[in-house]
């Protein structure tokens, strides 16, 4: 964090806090220009501790408008070097993984490995650990897939095996610093939303974006429909599984393809049935058990859950379109 006392080069935030800090009913949105300047300063460490905390809590209460989110996203993506992936049959796919598993097994690594097996360059980026949850990083480690340690290593792994896991501190260290403030403040901040919608590739790839609450779906749809720069490369939007962008094995959720200002439903939601046979899943959600089961699926000793197979087919189809 930055020093609390003002110092040369510090970005003054009082006039912004005055607008966004009036509570959920009285707060006003900042202009895109002011939002970009403010979030850029936060990324660069030019905001004092007390003002940084005030801004984060103000947005926590107010929420970001689509225009503010687009401006923050532009600043976020300018804060790290975008990844270069050789042109091929498929566009690259990025899967954010910042929540991990708490009740359901974490199937993000299986999703990524199934996509890589189809020749789709797949980047999973996220946190390495999260108390009380099983992260994708932990499952990848049990499968012998080590995290990339640099941008060149991410690019090399995507080129050689069509799969890479990048800790956020490797992919985008400035974002990682703001993300880590949750441990101090006890609550998430705008950066937790931004890392889940990053476009990490220099030649835009397809993003998997998930939501938990219906109102968040509407705000994401507004972001991608109304802000072309934020939508470049397109996104597949669906309700997540415990905050992860992987299919829910218990029911088929709707999958929308957001591209070129439109939202196209590719997979319709289906009602869950008490008579339906539940998908075969790991007996436990711990990393060792999940990794062993994942390997069994890859080896053909266990079936791919139907909703996950449909998700893979949908992603591959979109990634291979011009």
Report residues per predicted region.
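Acidic, glycine/proline-rich low-complexity segments that act as flexible tails and inter-domain linkers
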Residues: 1-104, 116-122, 275-284, 291-303, ...
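Residue-level signal for inorganic ion chemistry
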Residues: 55, 140, 195, 312
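Self-splicing inteins and homing endonuclease
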Residues: 73-99, 152-179, 271
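Short coil/turn connectors at secondary-structure junctions
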Residues: 87-93, 117-121, 135, 159-163, ...
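A generic, well-ordered mixed alpha/beta core segment in the N-terminal half of proteins
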Residues: 88-156
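Flexible, glycine/proline-enriched loop segments at strand-loop-helix junctions
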Residues: 123-130, 138-146, 161-169, 204-212
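Phosphate/diphosphate-binding glycine-rich loops and adjacent basic-rich segments that engage nucleotide
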Residues: 151-211
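A structural signal for small-residue-enriched, beta-sheet-centric alpha/beta enzyme cores
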Residues: 185-296, 305
């Amino acid at each position: 964090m930055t020093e609390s006392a003002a110092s040369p080069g510090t970005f003054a935030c009082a006039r912004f806090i005055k607008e966004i800090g009036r509570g959920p009913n009285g707060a006003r949105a900042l202009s895109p220009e002011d939002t970009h300047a403010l979030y850029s300063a936060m990324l660069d460490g030019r905001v004092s501790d007390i003002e940084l905390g005030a801004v984060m809590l103000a947005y926590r209460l107010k929420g970001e408008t689509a225009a503010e989110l687009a401006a923050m996203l532009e600043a976020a993506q300018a804060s790290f070097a975008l990844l270069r992936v050789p042109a091929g049959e498929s566009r690259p796919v990025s899967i954010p993984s910042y929540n991990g598993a708490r009740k359901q097994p974490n199937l993000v690594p299986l999703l990524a490995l199934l996509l890589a097996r189809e020749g789709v360059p797949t980047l999973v980026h996220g946190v390495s650990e999260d108390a009380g949850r099983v992260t994708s990083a932990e499952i990848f480690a049990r499968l012998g897939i080590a995290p990339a340690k640099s941008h060149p290593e991410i690019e090399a792994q995507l080129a050689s095996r069509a799969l890479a896991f990048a800790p956020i501190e490797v992919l985008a260290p400035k974002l990682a610093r703001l993300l880590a403030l949750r441990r101090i403040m006890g609550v998430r901040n705008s950066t937790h939303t931004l890392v889940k919608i990053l476009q990490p590739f220099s030649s835009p790839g397809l993003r998997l974006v998930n939501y938990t609450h219906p109102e968040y779906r509407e705000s994401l749809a507004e972001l991608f429909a109304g802000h072309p720069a934020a939508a470049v490369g397109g996104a597949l939007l669906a309700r997540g599984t415990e905050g992860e962008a992987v299919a829910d094995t218990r029911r088929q959720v709707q999958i929308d393809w957001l591209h070129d200002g439109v939202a196209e439903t590719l997979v319709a939601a289906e009602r869950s049935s008490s008579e339906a046979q539940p998908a075969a899943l790991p007996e436990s959600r711990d990393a060792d058990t999940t990794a062993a089961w994942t390997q069994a699926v890859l080896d053909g000793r266990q079936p791919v859950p139907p909703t996950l197979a449909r998700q893979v087919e949908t992603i591959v189809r979109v990634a291979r379109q011009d």
